[in-house]
From Swiss-Prot:
EC number: 3.5.1.5
Top-rank taxon, per record: Bacteria
Biological processes, Gene Ontology terms: urea catabolic process
Pathway it works in: Nitrogen metabolism; urea degradation; CO(2) and NH(3) from urea (urease route): step 1/1
HAMAP family in the cross-refs: Urease_beta (MF_01954)
GO molecular function: urease activity
Homology family: Belongs to the urease beta subunit family.
Name of the protein in question: Urease subunit beta
The organism of origin for this protein: Citrobacter koseri (strain ATCC BAA-895 / CDC 4225-83 / SGSC4696)
InterPro entries (UniProt xref): Urease_beta-like, Urease_betasu_sf, Urease_subunit
Oligomer status and interactors: Heterotrimer of UreA (gamma), UreB (beta) and UreC (alpha) subunits. Three heterotrimers associate to form the active enzyme.
Amino acid sequence: MIPGEYRISTGNIAINTGRETCTIVVENHGDRPVQVGSHYHFYEVNPALRFDRQAARGFRLNIPAGTAVRFEPGQKREVELVRVAGAQRIFGFRGEVMGSLEADND
């Protein structure tokens, strides 16, 4: 094996099987690209991205870990989100939740 080399099996790898998902349409109203990582709480992404934020509360992008989706200025696209796993508590990001997702949904 060469350092940094990947050995990937053939075929597809199922991720987030059986988890709740939703699909939303996102549009970048900003003048710069916005990139969102795989585990970022989508509800709290850059305000230049316009979409139904309440629908995204408690969800992240349904993409492989360590990857990201880039939204170019003016671009509109549909993305699939997956429910955050675990205790349903979110801290950090933009500081808009800072605790349980079950608490006040405003």
